[in-house]
Amino acid sequence: KILKGPLGSVATRLMSESFFSHQFRSIFSDQHPVTDQGVADNWALLVNNDGNRLGHKLVSYMTERVIYADRWHGAITNWQGDLRLAWGMQDPVALPEVLDGLLELHPDLPVTRWEDLGHYPQIEDPPRFAAAVDESMAASGSPL
């Protein structure tokens, strides 16, 4: 919320590696915490070319998801191809209620629910994530 406000650009300039570390760690599940090296790598990616000073500009998606809700919902409800979801049920960002909303739009949508994963399943459990991608591609007839 702070990033969306008039002090957003100031807040992004004041963000420290310590603050980032705390926030980033909080979106991983307790069972699969991010490593110190993972935090350091992601901080390095964020600060490259002063990317850490753009946070207030990147949160525009929060407003856009309201403005373009019909378009985004239509992309789910009208999709003609194979569509599947994998969801980390401990994700504090994309809460289970978000998944429930997607399932209201597309009730027959196959979902893999990972009770022990958070916001970044691909980092928390790469083999399981890769297996889900392989399974999804095989089910859709896509070449592996």
Say what each PLM segment does:
Residues 1-106, 110-113, 134, 139-141:
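Flexible "cap/lid" subdomain of the alpha/beta-hydrolase fold that forms the substrate-access gate
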Residues 114-130:
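Catalytic histidine-centered segment of alpha/beta-hydrolase-like enzymes
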Residues 144:
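A conserved nucleotide-sugar
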